[in-house]
Amino acid sequence: FRLLPNALESAITPSTKAVLLGYPANPTGATMSRAALEAIADVVERHDLFVISDEIYDRLVYGVEHVSFPSLPRMKERTILLGGFSKAYAMTGWRLGYVCAPPLITDAMMRVHQYIMMSAPTAAQYAALEALRNGEEDVQGMLGEYNRRRQLVIKSCLDMGLGLNEPH
């Protein structure tokens, strides 16, 4: 699944305030090229929308470059970027994520957050810090193994005569 600009355009109503993008996408492995994202950005800008960009799988792409939506021209101030440590750093279950967004948005989020969450567990915060400081070798090892498995499944499907859209 890849969102097309014309499909987005036709789904926008006067009450639309934001678009949710989830890419790279699990389980399809779909990701979006810079050109495709720029076309989405044009629609977003034309309709004065925000984008909630769930990029939790940003490190788990193969054979293509991941393009982060807020890196596009004029999109940083329109994007609420969601990320986390569970996928790339194998910290599933730790439930430690982050948001990058304009202050107007993060200020409003904090007003709600303070009443529904105490804080992330201290151990998870220290683990995430350690992952950022010293975990890249482990990430690369996991990515290599995941890619080996991905290639095995792709080859097996093709050997059996099955068509497929290669996951990235």
Model-found features: residue ranges?
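Conserved core segment of the aminotransferase class I/II
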Residues: 77-147, 151-156, 160
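A short, flexible beta-alpha/helix-coil linker loop
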Residues: 24-27, 134-135
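Walker B catalytic acidic pair
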Residues: 23, 55
